């Protein structure tokens, strides 16, 4: 496990973020895609309109918690990358008493605990989470995230 400072470049969805990673001594890795380790968030890019609402709410939670250009701490969880070529890691948030973003996402019902098991095994928990998430009109506006 390694720890780096990084700048938030783009929130792709509730469990994927693009960052610039500071390796130290003026060396940066630019536009690296990070998959949040240990969680699964609803999809924001799907034709399922109901799931999309919750996926956009999850994405908004991440955007509000880690604004663009903010500096965060990234802890990589495994050497290398996951099956889709993304870095696997967690964000430790200095503005939130060093809480981990993945744990905040689960606590606030924007994601479920996930470690590679079948998506069918976590479907019920995603549905239960919907009972706790408030969908704001901003999330439903297609221009909100552009």
Label for each model-derived stretch:
Residues 1-146:
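Small beta-barrel nucleic-acid-binding modules, primarily SNase/OB-fold domains
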């Amino acid at each position: 496990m390694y720890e780096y400072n990084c700048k938030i470049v783009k929130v792709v969805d509730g469990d994927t973020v693009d960052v610039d990673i500071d390796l130290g001594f003026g060396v940066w890795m630019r536009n690296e895609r990070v998959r949040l380790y240990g969680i699964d968030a609803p999809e924001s890019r799907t034709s399922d309109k109901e799931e999309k609402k919750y996926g956009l709410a999850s994405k908004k939670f991440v955007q509000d918690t880690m604004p663009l250009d903010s500096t965060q701490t990234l802890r990589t969880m495994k050497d290398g990358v996951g099956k889709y070529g993304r870095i696997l890691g967690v964000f430790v948030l200095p503005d939130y008493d060093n809480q981990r973003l993945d744990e905040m996402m689960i606590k606030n019902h924007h994601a479920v605990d996930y470690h590679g098991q079948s998506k069918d095994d976590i479907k019920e928990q995603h549905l239960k989470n919907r009972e706790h998430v408030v969908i704001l009109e901003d999330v439903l506006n297609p221009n909100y995230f552009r």
